[in-house]
Amino acid sequence: AAEGFRWKDRFKGWGIPSRADGSRRYGVGMGLSGHSDIGGMASNTNVTMTSAGGVMIQTVMTEFGSGVRDVYRKIVAEELCIPVDRVRVSISDTSAAPLDFGSIASRSTYSGGISAQRAARDLKKNLFQLAEERLGIPASDWDFKDGMLKRLSNPEEVHDLHEILIYPDSLSGTGHWPGIDNATIMHVQFVEVAVDTETGLIEITDHFGGSDAGTIMNPRAAYNQMTSFFAGLDVAIREETVWDKWDNKVLNPNLIEYKARTFNEAPPHDHVCLESTKGRESD
């Protein structure tokens, strides 16, 4: 992010403008932040496979525009080595799905995703145990791929799923995530600000940000989320909450007349999302 913003070329020292243009003085700054709530509190998920090979994920996690339900489908499909279109997600019904802290504080993909992955792994374990009971082959000697049971010690030996799960039977796995407190997402933001020393006008003229997002499950959505936050700058430069100094009441007549910028007024801005292995599920 620092390289993308050209920080070394622009920063001249604290209190020193990076450049000047008439009455306008330009300065650069940076800010760091961390969001530590994504792994907290427990999550629980059930994953069920039918004898026809379809898979249903039961979770109370709610789709609120981030694509999290598609993320669960990807995670479970990858764990079970089956096409994504064979995986569905149940409606978010707390009376039918396992208890969960829910979709809040950026935890849906991290906490719910790990819980879904563990449920898929538990489903495979139960499937291999059932194969041992019905075919007499140790559970440790099985693999599951493309909807077929394959023997590890003899790759030529392949069994259809319905040989183990007799129609209309099904098999389920459960996944639990207890929650942790150190799955922190790190962010850095660089901005260039122009201040007119005669009029006092403040303008953001350039921005570049960076995020450590862990494992990126949906690259386009992640990039869009990181860049679309830019409208939040208006909280700092175009909005003001006036407080009564005696009783701390808000004196603004209303909260609906903030001067939001148009798309054409947005300065150049970009963002880079980096992957890391911090807090990644590895058990």
Listing of model-derived features with the role each one plays in the protein:
Residues A1-G27, G31-H35, K74-D283:
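C-terminal catalytic domains of large/alpha subunits in multi-subunit enzymes
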Residues R69-D70:
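Conserved strand-to-helix beginnings and helix N-cap segments that scaffold or border functional pockets
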Residues G27-V60, S66:
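Conserved beta-alpha junction segments in alpha/beta enzyme cores
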Residues M61-T62, Q117:
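Conserved short loop/turn motifs at secondary-structure junctions
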